[in-house]
Curated annotation (Swiss-Prot):
One of its GO terms (cellular component) is cytosol. GO terms for molecular function: peptidyl-prolyl cis-trans isomerase activity. The keyword Isomerase applies. There is a cross-link at residues 390, 691 (Glycyl lysine isopeptide (Lys-Gly) (interchain with G-Cter in SUMO2)). This is Peptidyl-prolyl cis-trans isomerase G. Residues 194-214 have a biased composition (Low complexity). One of its GO terms (biological process) is protein folding. The modification Phosphoserine is found at residues 252, 254-255, 257, 288, 313, 354, 384, 395, 411, 413, 685, 688, 694, 742-743, 751. Residues 290-308, 346-366, 377-447, 462-552, 577-598, 626-684, 706-752 have a biased composition (Basic and acidic residues).
Length: 752
């Protein structure tokens, strides 16, 4: 008969959120797996000190239950980290699986948690339902004897996604339970030994008293004691047999009831697929080594893809992304297309030959739109036409400024105009490129500066003319004077013909080129004459005295005829210019009128909507019309006054010049010496005389013609002018009355 060994027991005192929840007592199956039970018992008592790898005490005290899965299990035992990644056995690190004899066939079993085969450490779990799917993977080494309700309370705690309970479930204290049955047996043995000694003492006293008796009684007592011992042994054997039978009889119904209970117990509703995996212990590993299963799966997937897609073909997902151009090329990659191949058909693609991308071409087109369109192509020397186009597009205020400048030009003499035109041509040639680049706003400033420069150039030209005339009079001879006169005639005829014709841009170019050539010829000839003068002075001095007497009469007659012809030509030019100006002014005035009528037509629709504003605008227009008419009348009066003054001054000049001529003729006849004649020739050269006489004749002819025009004006025109002036005055008075009678308007009306 083998003696039955009692299994070791351990306990946990558990607290939830630092509040004691109760004690759980475990019975360890030391007979089935002694090594695992010894590991658990030592961790409960903490008798093994610190761990080799973790360097922490090998003790479950103050350890957490870090993983709780309802209807499955409650896990703990990670004393190093407290999250399921730590722990260590008393043997150092991990130890092997000992036995899978006991199955997970009931609830409240104590089993070892691991990370795979032979990876048992300090972590354990208590099942709350039968879990047969864990058989063969985890070693069962104990069961819960008492404290099942505490385990249920831990199971019912709320958890997060990682199955960690929100409440802190901690082991306050733990240890081993020693059974009391051993102490009782020892006490019983001691009690039996004491009773047997007392009985032996009593027997010895009785023997001493009866020593006197006979030896027969002694032998009889010995036999009786032997019989008693035999009987006692027999009885003890019988009792033992009976006890064994009773125990067997008790065990058989209990085993049947246990089997029935196992069948009646509900199995776990949790599937093994739903159980979350146990976190791996990676410790200091930066990258975990790839598993063999994962490698095999990847290899299988690659083989399937190769079988489905041959080496030349591409996957379907990428084939959808590829775009094909017109030429048949596949476009790979992401993002918008920046370049494309040219189409083979010319009709399809407009920009077949251009290599610039479309987005670049769009930017170029936008930049071209921003450039100012200059209209017609600019020809060399056409600055005046461009200025006229720009001035026509401007407001009527600028037209009035033009009229004032035109009046100033009228008052100037024709000789000065010719000289100004020559200078203006040089100035125009220099400033052609500048004027093209400038805008319309800069053109206004340029015109104003031009008017100022003309005034300055007049004074300079006068001083230059005087100095040149003196030098030429002293140097040039009569033969040179004749040549100069003939050239001047030809130029005058050419200028009159060209001015009578309508001016074209090509004609202007020809005029400018001719004037430049003439000026160059005159300069070259003057230089030649200066060189030859010094040689010919002696010869000419002798011939002058002889020829003067003969040529005086001829020269006087010829000069008169020339002066008359020149005066006629110039009067014609003046008339043509005045007519042209009047026409241009009338055209500009008609344009201005048409613009005003258009504005009035547009404003009528607005006036219907807003009658108050239309009245104020009508008043402003009337005032402007009246002011413009008054200005025109004042300008015409100033013209008449200026012409009359010019005629008077010309008459006075003629009288004074006639007196001077008679006086000089008498002096010339009376003088006998040649020296006086030479001095008179130096003081007054024939060129200067001809210029003065020509100027006088021109002024006379212009004044006479102006007087004739004024006389020939019909009385009907005068009456029309008077009636127009009366109407304007009448309108002006009405406007004033309306302004006085009307209510106080806005700031705009007052300013208008």
């Amino acid at each position: 008969m083998g003696i039955k060994v009692q299994r070791p027991r351990c306990f946990f005192d558990i607290a939830i959120n630092n509040q004691p929840a109760g004690r759980v007592v475990f019975e360890l199956f030391s007979d089935v797996c002694p090594k695992t039970c010894e590991n658990f018992r030592c961790l409960c008592t903490g008798e093994k000190g610190t761990g080799k790898s973790t360097q922490k005490p090998l003790h479950y005290k103050s350890c957490l239950f870090h993983r709780v899965v309802k209807d499955f299990m409650v896990q703990g035992g990670d004393f190093s980290e407290g999250n399921g990644r730590g722990g260590e056995s008393i043997y150092g690190g991990f130890f092997e699986d000992e036995s899978f004899a006991v199955k997970h066939n009931k609830e409240f079993l104590l089993s070892m948690a691991n990370r795979g085969k032979d990876t048992n450490g300090s972590q354990f779990f208590i099942t709350t339902k039968p879990t047969p799917h864990l058989d063969g993977h985890h070693v069962v080494f104990g069961q819960v004897i008492s404290g099942q309700e505490v385990v249920r309370e831990i199971e019912n705690q709320k958890t997060d996604a990682a199955s960690k309970p929100f409440a802190e479930v901690r082991i306050l204290s733990c240890g081993e339970l020693i059974p009391k049955s051993k102490v009782k047996k020892e006490e019983k043995k001691r009690h039996k030994s004491s009773s047997s000694s007392s009985s032996s003492d009593s027997d010895s006293s009785s023997d001493s008293q009866s020593s006197s008796e006979s030896s027969d009684s002694e032998s009889a007592s010995e036999e009786k004691s032997r019989k008693r011992k035999k009987k006692h042994r027999k009885n003890s054997r019988k009792h033992k047999k009976e006890k064994k039978k009773r125990k067997k009889s008790k065990k058989s119904p209990s085993s049947e009831s246990e089997a029935e209970n196992v069948d009646a117990q509900p199995q776990s509703t949790v599937r093994p697929e739903e159980i979350p995996p146990i976190p791996e212990n990676r410790f200091l590993m930066r990258k975990s080594p790839p598993k063999a299963d994962d490698k095999e799966r990847k290899n299988r997937e690659r083989e399937r893809e190769r079988e489905c897609n041959p080496p030349n073909s591409q996957p379907a997902s990428y084939q959808r992304r590829f775009l094909v151009t017109r030429s048949g090329r596949k476009i790979k990659g992401r993002g918008p297309r920046r370049y494309r191949t040219p189409s083979r058909s010319r009709s399809r693609d407009r920009f077949r030959r251009s290599e610039t991308p479309p987005h670049w071409r769009q930017e170029m087109q936008r930049a071209q739109r921003m450039r100012v369109s200059s209209g017609e192509r600019w020809i060399k020397g056409d600055k005046s036409e461009l200025n006229e186009i720009k001035e026509n597009q401007r407001s009527p205020v600028r037209v009035k400024e033009k009229k004032i400048t035109d009046h100033r030009h009228m008052s100037e003499s024709p000789n000065r105009k010719v000289e100004k035109e020559k200078k203006a041509k040089d100035h125009k040639s220099e400033s052609k490129e500048r004027d093209i680049r400038r805008n319309s706003e800069k053109d206004d400033k340029y015109n104003k500066n031009k008017v100022k420069k003309r005034g300055k150039s007049k004074s300079r030209s006068k001083s230059k003319e005087r100095s040149k005339s003196k030098e030429r009079d002293s140097k040039h001879s009569r033969h040179e004077d004749k040549r100069v006169r003939s050239r001047s005639k030809e130029r005058d005829h050419e200028t009159t013909k060209e001015k009578e014709k309508p001016l074209d841009p090509k004609g202007k170019d020809q005029e400018r080129s001719r004037s430049k050539e003439n000026s160059k010829q005159v300069e070259s000839k003057s230089n030649e004459h200066d060189h030859s003068k010094s040689k010919e002075k002696d010869r000419r001095a002798q011939s002058r005295s002889r020829e003067r007497d003969l040529t005086k009469s001829k020269h006087s007659y010829n000069s008169r005829t020339r002066e008359r012809s020149r005066s006629r030509d110039r009067s014609r030019r003046v008339r043509s210019r005045s007519h042209d100006r009047d026409r241009s002014r009338s055209k500009e005035y008609h344009r201005y009128r048409e613009q005003e009528y258009r504005r009035r037509g547009r404003s009528r629709s607005r006036d219907r909507r807003t009658p108050g504003r239309s009245r104020s605008k009508d008043r402003r227009r009337r005032r402007r019309d009246s002011r413009s008419s008054e200005r025109e009348e004042s300008q015409s009066r100033n013209k008449d006054k200026y012409r009359s003054q010019e005629s008077k001054s010309s008459h006075r000049k003629e009288n004074s010049e006639g007196e001077k001529r008679t006086y000089s003729k008498s002096r010339d006849h009376n003088s006998s010496s040649n020296n006086r004649e030479k001095k008179a020739d130096r003081e007054q050269s024939p060129v200067s005389k001809t210029k003065q006489s020509s100027q006088d004749n021109e002024v006379k002819s212009s004044t006479l013609k102006n007087q004739e025009d004024e006389k020939t004006r019909s009385p009907v025109e005068k009456e029309n002018q008077k009636s127009k002036g009366q109407e304007n005055d009448h309108v002006h008075d009405k406007n004033k009355k309306c302004d006085h009678e009307s209510s106080p308007g806005t700031d705009e009306d007052k300013s208008g």
